[in-house]
């Protein structure tokens, strides 16, 4: 990504280095400059969409969830239309981001899914628009439901309690 930011993209590029570092990528993972990548069966009925550090967490979560796949966004603006189309095929879509709810990438995806006319249920989990006190990364992820256990619980709970 840094190479592309310096030598390829002509405009401004933001690179985020999260506090606490990045987790180890899964075996066989290689960044291939595509705007997104699908992990798991894209025909599954549930889809987790994320980017950044939470990708590893979501990937771990699908190990405990049935019939679920992950879309990892490598580029968050603009969201690739193919990523929107892939998510729209699922019956339930959960977007997890380590950013604020308002103006976040999840809101953008929700708008794009609405424009597409998807009938899938959409859930957006992010940090509320409030002051976040200093604490360890792990405790904050738990507090805001962005850890593996919370993700697994939320997805399973939604399945048990359909709208």
Language model: regions and residue ranges:
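Thiamine diphosphate
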Residues: 7-163
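Internal gly/pro-rich beta-alpha loop/helix module
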Residues: 1-6
């Amino acid at each position: 990504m840094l190479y592309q930011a310096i030598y390829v993209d002509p405009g401004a590029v933001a690179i985020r280095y999260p506090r606490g570092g990045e987790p180890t990528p899964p075996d066989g993972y290689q960044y291939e400059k595509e705007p997104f990548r699908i992990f798991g069966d894209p025909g599954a009925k549930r889809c987790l969409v994320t980017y950044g550090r939470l990708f590893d967490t979501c990937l771990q979560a699908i190990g405990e969830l049935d019939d679920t796949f992950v879309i990892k966004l490598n580029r968050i603006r603009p969201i690739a239309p193919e990523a929107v189309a892939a998510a729209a095929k699922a019956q339930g879509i959960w977007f997890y981001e380590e950013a604020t709810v308002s103006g976040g990438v999840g809101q953008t995806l929700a708008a794009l899914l609405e424009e597409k006319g998807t009938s899938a249920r959409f859930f957006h989990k992010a940090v509320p628009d409030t002051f976040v006190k200093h604490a360890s990364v792990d405790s904050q992820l738990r507090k805001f439901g962005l850890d593996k256990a919370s993700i697994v619980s939320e997805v399973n709970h939604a399945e048990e309690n359909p709208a």
